[in-house]
Regions:
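Phosphate/pyrophosphate- and phosphate-bearing ligand-binding catalytic cores of soluble enzymes
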Residues: 45-201, 217-232
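A short, local hydrophobic-aromatic micro-motif
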Residues: 1-4, 33, 46, 73
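A gly/ser-rich beta-alpha-beta helix-loop segment of oxidoreductase catalytic cores
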Residues: 3-34
């Protein structure tokens, strides 16, 4: 067990390391032992430890250091023989209240949650979560909830609170909105979708409009989680 919470995230093993994918309380950094990497410049194959990967929130050394031409060839994961389910995510905790589920049961539950909340990329064009969940100081969060008392925050235990970008966007009235050929998913406000003929420019314009609205209403600056290749 160890990666069941990451079930149904589309992509490849190398991309999982590059992005430090995460969902439902688990990130790849929690289970990665090492990665074999090809340095195209020197032709050398190197082994990167977990520490060498310099993981951050949806980030890694492979993402921040683009000057080096590196290809992730293979990854080694450290999984647990004894099942220790991570039920920190509220929906999972509710589903398994008073029970210790198996890794397979958690996997099936995560798949069910994802299918209900997120459009599948093969059916509706999207890149998953478009924005990162912002983190602010606890003192700033206290000020924020004095104006928005129903706003949820997740204490990080280090003097900061993580907010739900989806909740911020939804409270601004953007869930399910469309702009021409693109829009915000009606299933999850953090997912921007292409209904078939949308362009990169339309998606980026939509993202900019959402960022501006959230900034105006909450004073929060949303950062993209997706990586834009090239430019409109």
């Amino acid at each position: 067990s160890g990666i069941e919470n990451l079930s149904l995230i589309p992509g490849t093993a190398g991309a999982a390391v590059y992005q430090n994918i995460g969902a439902y309380g688990v990130e790849l950094k929690d289970v990665l032992e090492s990665a074999k990497v090809l340095d195209i410049g020197s032709g050398e194959i190197k082994t990167y430890s977990n520490k060498d990967c310099k993981f951050g929130y949806r980030n890694s050394v492979f993402k921040t250091n683009k000057k080096q031409d590196l290809i992730i060839l293979k990854i080694n994961l450290r999984l647990l023989k004894n099942n220790e389910p991570n039920l920190n995510y509220p929906d999972l905790a509710k589903m398994f209240e008073g029970k210790k589920p198996s890794a397979l049961e958690v996997r099936n539950a995560v798949i069910e949650i994802r299918k209900n909340k997120l459009p599948y990329p093969a059916e509706v064009g999207n890149a998953g979560s478009f924005f990162k969940n912002p983190t602010i100081k606890t003192s700033n969060f206290q000020f924020l909830i004095s104006k928005h008392p129903d706003l949820k925050g997740f204490d990080q235990g280090d003097g900061t609170v993580k907010l739900s970008a989806a909740e911020l966007i939804e409270k601004c009235g953007w869930k399910g909105k469309t702009r021409g050929n693109v829009g915000v998913s009606g299933k999850h406000a953090l997912v921007l979708v292409n209904y078939g003929k949308g362009t990169e420019e339309e998606i980026l314009d939509l993202a900019k409009e959402i960022k501006n609205v959230v900034r105006d209403q909450f004073g929060m600056e949303l950062e993209p989680e997706v990586e834009v290749v090239g430019g409109a």
